[in-house]
Amino acid sequence: MSAFTQHTGIALPLNITNIDTDNIIPKQFLKITSRSNLGKYLFFNWRYLENTPHTPNINFVLNNPYYQNASILITRKNFGCGSSREHAVWALIDYGFRVIIASSFANIFYKNSFNNRLLLVTLSESEIHSIFQNIHIHTHNNNKLFITVNLCENTVSIKNKKYFFKIKDSYRNYMLNNLDKISLTLKFESNIQKHENNQPLFLK
């Protein structure tokens, strides 16, 4: 993924609390080692009918043509709870999501997301509720809701309304400069090499 400064996209509402990683991508798909093509398994058990796999559940929001090409997911508290599985982040990214906005996230999922440069935005419950209401109004009027997330200003903008969010400087740096832990470490490669060269012989 490229560096993230600002993104404008269609908002998709997933009005469910405590969505765990098994909901995001079920365990049977964890044997897949490639990050590509995981998007088709995103929310698999909700997205497809139980007794006829791969038959879309027309009542699930991801199958609503109205939200096709959505890139900003709006959801509720404790998103990404449950077991640690990086596949959950990979599936969200491969589907096309660039930003997830919720009132809280599970800690390990939060770290995995930023390591893969998926931006997570935390807003208050009341602010999340306001956004859901805004989406409902737009949908009722047959208008898609576009949201702009500006990481330089730490803002979420919906028309004339702005919400401000906080983010750790380290994670913000990852996103703005397209870094991960490996690329960040490689910035200090010369220092690491110098340290290794100065090690006593018995440590080499």
Curated annotation (Swiss-Prot):
SUPFAM superfamilies per the UniProt record, alphabetical: LeuD/IlvD-like (SSF52016)
Q: Which reaction does it catalyse?
A: (2R,3S)-3-isopropylmalate = (2S)-2-isopropylmalate
- Keyword annotations from UniProtKB, A to Z: Amino-acid biosynthesis, Branched-chain amino acid biosynthesis, Leucine biosynthesis, Lyase
Q: Which Gene3D superfamilies match?
A: Aconitase, domain 4 (3.20.19.10)
GO cellular component terms, semicolon-separated: 3-isopropylmalate dehydratase complex
Give the EC class as a word: lyase
Describe which pathway this protein belongs to, using the record's wording. Answer: Amino-acid biosynthesis; L-leucine biosynthesis; L-leucine from 3-methyl-2-oxobutanoate: step 2/4
Segment forming the signal sequence: none
Please give one Gene Ontology molecular function term for this protein. 3-isopropylmalate dehydratase activity
Q: Which domain of life is it from?
A: Bacteria
What HAMAP family does the database record attribute to this sequence? LeuD_type1
Can you state the subunit structure given in the record? Heterodimer of LeuC and LeuD.
Name under which the protein is recorded = 3-isopropylmalate dehydratase small subunit
- Origin organism of this chain? Blochmanniella floridana
